[in-house]
């Protein structure tokens, strides 16, 4: 049976939708809508379902595209060409979404599918996907784009790294604990169908050789490790960009107001959280040139990704949004020849191994494996450079790279795990003169730094050419480094050559999702009409589960429309 195309009911807002898992779990009754007065930016008069006005209005410093015709009966545009320090008029919509990563995107997709007349504004700090290109490919080094074009912009950071969709609820964070395993797995199927309808490859990695998988698992068990074999749909970096480009076009054509190069500075909260009377009324935003205005909305969704995790943590503290510090992952990205990982790559594509090595028994795991891939650099606010990896469908290297992450849980009185991880990252950057550090594993065991001339003689040639040879152990804490070393030695028992002397370790690899927003199964926070999704919420880790959280949120909001 041929795969349905872009004209499928899922994409075009048919009422014939897949079942809404959350709605079957006993949702709260929808609160009555309050009518918002028209304003001098957008003026509404009625809500026809089928009239669609497609327009792009651009004012200095903010691109607003996809003005809803079915939500805007009469469109009045009075956008002033104001100076950068003046305030512009407010905007009123039904739903405002902060962050155009997978969680924010799928909130909009699912909401439009079941409630196509909903007026939605999607606020994104970065650029449209067609303008998201890293200059490093041309100039050979990071030029410090602000904000980083790899971590910000439409589709977020995950889709721009390797584009892997994990098709099991066992991978991707703790969301199943919140909503239930069955609900999570059913939502994965709906999200996967959506990606397929936008052009994802139908081939699934890791399901063709169960006998080989069983043997790899046996070897892992003998080494004291757990293998999580998860089916993977690999988009590839270049294919992910094509798919998300189609999704961006679809949202624009459906009338979503896409506000790029626009930063959310605050949420608008009325009432008192201490007396359970607090409610979110929208957000305040600032454009690239400094213009500020408010977006008033009945529902506010914050999905700022790992890059926005510390910002959301500050927001939670300022507005008494209930949250708690969670674990933080600190580690390295390792790189080795494809020959070492050939069997695992061919059978599983991505091996997810978990261990609790002596002496500290911290959880250590592999993450984001890229056969034939490339190590990359990402920049966060403040110029923090962190390492990542990605892979292409067509372009291949001679190496495989993957992350090894050590999970740190902190006890009272310490409650700043994100700041802790950033300090470690800053120390790595200082030792590398602003660049990513790289060191050979054999040199670590020998207690010496790595020199550039030694890398040039190695069988493993770095795919991040501007990484600086040095001493990773001088930057990572003893507990972290010891756990990583012992984990690598254990993996070497299951995959001979994994811990060879020439295996490269790049640092720092940091995952900023340690702030966990307290929510219920309906994805409600303690602030009415405010929802926090994706990796910044602390509940998901990765592309698929962030998409799932957005899918469920969109279905929930549509049921109340």
Features from the language model and the residues they span:
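Intrinsically disordered, low-complexity terminal tails and inter-domain linkers enriched
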Residues: 27-30, 37, 42-48, 60-71, ...
């Amino acid at each position: 049976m041929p795969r349905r195309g872009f004209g499928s009911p899922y994409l075009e807002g048919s009422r014939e939708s897949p079942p809404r898992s959350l709605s079957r779990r006993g949702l709260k009754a929808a609160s009555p809508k309050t009518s918002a007065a028209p304003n001098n930016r957008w003026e509404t008069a009625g809500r026809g379902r089928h009239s669609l006005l497609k327009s792009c209005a651009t004012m200095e410093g903010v691109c607003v595209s996809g003005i809803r015709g079915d939500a805007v009966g009469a469109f009045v545009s009075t956008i002033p060409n104001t100076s950068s320090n003046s305030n512009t008029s407010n905007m009123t919509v039904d739903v405002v979404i902060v962050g155009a990563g997978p969680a924010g995107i799928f909130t909009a997709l699912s909401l439009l599918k079941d409630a196509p007349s909903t007026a939605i504004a999607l606020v994104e700090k970065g650029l449209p996907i067609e303008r998201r290109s890293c200059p490093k490919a041309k100039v050979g080094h990071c030029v410090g784009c602000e904000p980083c074009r790899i971590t910000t912009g439409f589709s977020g950071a995950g889709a721009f790294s390797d584009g892997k969709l994990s098709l099991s609820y066992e991978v991707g964070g703790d969301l199943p604990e919140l909503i239930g395993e069955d609900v999570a797995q059913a939502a994965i199927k709906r999200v996967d169908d959506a990606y397929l309808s936008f052009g994802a490859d139908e081939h699934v990695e890791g399901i063709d050789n169960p006998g080989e998988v069983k043997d790899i698992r046996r070897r892992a068990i003998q080494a004291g490790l757990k293998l999580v074999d998860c089916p993977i749909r690999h988009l590839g970096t270049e294919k992910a960009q094509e798919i998300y480009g189609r999704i961006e076009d679809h949202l624009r054509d459906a009338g979503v107001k896409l506000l790029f190069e626009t930063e959310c500075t605050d949420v608008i909260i009325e009432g008192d959280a201490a007396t359970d009377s607090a409610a979110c009324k929208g957000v305040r935003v600032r454009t690239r040139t400094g213009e500020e205005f408010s977006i008033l909305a009945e529902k506010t969704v914050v999905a700022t990704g790992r890059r926005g995790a510390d910002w959301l943590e500050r927001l939670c503290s300022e507005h008494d949004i209930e949250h708690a510090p969670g674990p933080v992952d600190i580690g390295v990205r390792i790189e080795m020849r494809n020959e070492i990982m050939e069997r695992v790559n061919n059978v599983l594509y991505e091996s997810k191994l978990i261990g609790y090595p002596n002496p500290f028994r911290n959880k250590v795991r592999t993450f984001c494996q890229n056969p034939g891939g490339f190590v990359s650099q990402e920049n966060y606010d403040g110029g923090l450079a962190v390492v990542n990896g990605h892979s292409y469908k067509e372009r291949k290297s001679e190496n495989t790279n993957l992350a090894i992450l050590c999970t740190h849980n902190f006890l009272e009185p310490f409650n700043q795990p994100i700041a802790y991880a950033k300090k470690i990252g800053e120390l790595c950057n200082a030792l590398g003169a602003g660049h990513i550090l790289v060191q050979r594993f054999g040199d670590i065991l020998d207690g010496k730094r790595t020199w550039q001339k030694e890398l040039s003689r190695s069988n493993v040639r770095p795919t991040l050419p501007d990484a600086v040879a040095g001493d990773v152990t001088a930057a990572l804490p003893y507990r972290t480094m010891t756990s990583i070393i012992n984990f690598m030695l254990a993996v070497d028992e299951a995959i001979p050559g994994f811990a060879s002397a020439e295996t490269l370790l790049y640092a720092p690899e940091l995952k900023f999702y340690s702030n966990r927003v307290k929510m219920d199964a309906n994805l409600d926070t303690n602030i009415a009409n405010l929802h926090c999704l994706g990796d910044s919420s602390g509940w998901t880790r990765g592309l698929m589960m962030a998409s799932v959280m957005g899918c469920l949120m969109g279905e929930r909001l549509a049921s109340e429309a």
